[in-house]
């Protein structure tokens, strides 16, 4: 009863957006129906085996979310008695994901600006930002493992390395200032000069944006002879999170260019794991 009611021509799901599932959810709630989240639902979904296929899949979803945002821009942050899509909490949650790449770039620009102005506020903002990111990361991983322990045990390496090895190092730097650039070298009788310290500081300030560039390079070289080894290495360095943010950034570009909204599906292999 619900799908025909929210579909097109009263017969099918509305596929005018590349994120037809999100669009259906929005139309369901806007029609006064309640959408209930079922955390233990079993889903048989095909996972892309290559980065470029994952990029293609997620780009379609990301572009669809941008389209949904544009179509229902009048709904966000406008509370209603009919639905909950206008609640401020939902709007903050929605745009914190949709605009995350923009926030990452702006944070890097702001931190570098404060650093060049020799402001002590740069270190405070850096630590607050990355400690918050670390706590969110730990909470998300713990919640995911709790909801699906079997998959969590099978993919524990990917879960731990979701933010990337370098980002984990940056998190350690935020929690323990001076540990990696002063205390650890001192154990080996090495003293790093002020130039290294300044360079390291700049690196950790811009890394949150640089990681997206690294993810794009990993996708770019995957089809080359060196990509067989370099792409997995880069993904573990930069992380799956920055990869998804890079895809979201690509979705901005594609929508601004008014690229063709086609269902560019990935190759199906039909392999069952687990």
Regions found by a protein language model. Name each.
Residues 1-114, 270-274:
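Non-transmembrane catalytic domains and loops of membrane-associated enzymes and transporters
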Residues 74-84, 123-274:
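Juxtamembrane C-terminal module of membrane proteins
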